[in-house]
């Protein structure tokens, strides 16, 4: 069933942490990122064709269209094509980074399975289930936002009698006839659905990583808070519980290390692009867009915002979760514990003080503050265009 991984908790059939990526893996298979056990050759050929269509033909087609048709572009069409061009250039790099470090994805899933083994109580397993459902809901929300942009742009162009993205097509001249126009428009829309889905896949996985990581950090904190609270346990048993918590924390650190290479590079590319693309979109929306194009542009801006902001916000929450874990360790019931227990606790406390953090391209931290600073570039672009009256000049020309 399509929505089976959004179901409510059932004590006899709960989801596990690796199920957080279930819909994402469906998308991986459709985009050629996940090789099946059978028909590998056909799958490889199809994967190469999809990648070439989306990552090679799309930016080249836009460049050719610029050279051949730029004199016929309206300002609205020009800005739409420019914002698409920048994203089409960044998309292959994001896809490449994920696939270069795809071993980290599979390692992260194995580590999540190991973390699940520590979830022995029904309450913990239900907490994991709810976290998995949140991840799968996030994927479907992203899918809706990105698809809404593609469909709304197609509809706005169709209602205006213009091509949605003006991508060069060597086989169909959209000016010849009405049927040629629709062939070119449908070809562009099909291309964009694949390209947008590739972009979606490379944008959503950092968020999925972060959401399920927060669940296991919370469960670890709750286990730490319950240390030495059972009067029926001996000092040796309490120390074993502490050692298990230390091992859980090591699994979490290993998980963060496994996902870090792909995440940092992907977010770095997104930070480079978001300011420019958001600025072009705002110029288009404020100065040139009609009602239909405006709706499509708003959908595009929504897509730009969810590229980075949710994961940046989750990174801030992860930092807070790490601080809460340190506080839980320090305030746990250790005063009357054995010397050996206290020694292990100090070791745990020292390691836990190193927050789980990610940096974009190993240059600046991934956080809400960094995201806002990058997004400010968009307002700088709009101010620059407004002060130089570039919008008026484009309209007159």
UniProtKB/Swiss-Prot annotation:
Q: In which tissues is it expressed?
A: Expressed in olfactory sensory neurons in the antenna.
Topological domain (Cytoplasmic) residues are: 1-43, 99-138, 214-266, 315-354
Any Gene Ontology biological process: calcium ion transmembrane transport
- According to the lineage, what is the superkingdom? Eukaryota
> In Gene Ontology terms, what is one molecular function of this protein?
odorant binding
Any one GO CC term of this protein is: plasma membrane
Q: Which residues are glycosylated?
A: 187
Q: Which UniProt keywords apply?
A: Cell membrane, Glycoprotein, Membrane, Olfaction, Receptor, Sensory transduction, Transducer, Transmembrane, Transmembrane helix
Give the matching Pfam families.
7tm_6
State which ranges are Extracellular (membrane side): 65-77, 160-192, 288-293, 376-397
Q: Does the keyword GTP-binding apply?
A: no
Its topology with respect to the membrane? Multi-pass membrane protein
Which locations, inside or outside the cell, does it occupy?
Cell membrane
Q: Where does the sequence pass through the membrane?
A: 44-64, 78-98, 139-159, 193-213, 267-287, 294-314, 355-375
Q: What else is known?
A: The atypical heteromeric and topological design of the odorant receptors appears to be an insect-specific solution for odor recognition, making the OR/Orco complex an attractive target for the development of highly selective insect repellents to disrupt olfactory-mediated host-seeking behaviors of insect disease vectors. Odor-evoked OR currents are independent of known G-protein-coupled second messenger pathways.
What family, per the record? Answer: Belongs to the insect chemoreceptor superfamily. Heteromeric odorant receptor channel (TC 1.A.69) family. Or2a subfamily.
| Assembly and interaction partners | Interacts with Orco. Complexes exist early in the endomembrane system in olfactory sensory neurons (OSNs), coupling these complexes to the conserved ciliary trafficking pathway.
Role this protein plays: Odorant receptor which mediates acceptance or avoidance behavior, depending on its substrates. The odorant receptor repertoire encodes a large collection of odor stimuli that vary widely in identity, intensity, and duration. May form a complex with Orco to form odorant-sensing units, providing sensitive and prolonged odorant signaling and calcium permeability.
Q: Which PANTHER family match?
A: ODORANT RECEPTOR, ODORANT RECEPTOR 19A-RELATED
- What name does the UniProt record give this protein? Odorant receptor 98a
Which source organism?
Drosophila melanogaster
Source organism lineage? Eukaryota, Metazoa, Ecdysozoa, Arthropoda, Hexapoda
Q: Which gene encodes it?
A: Or98a
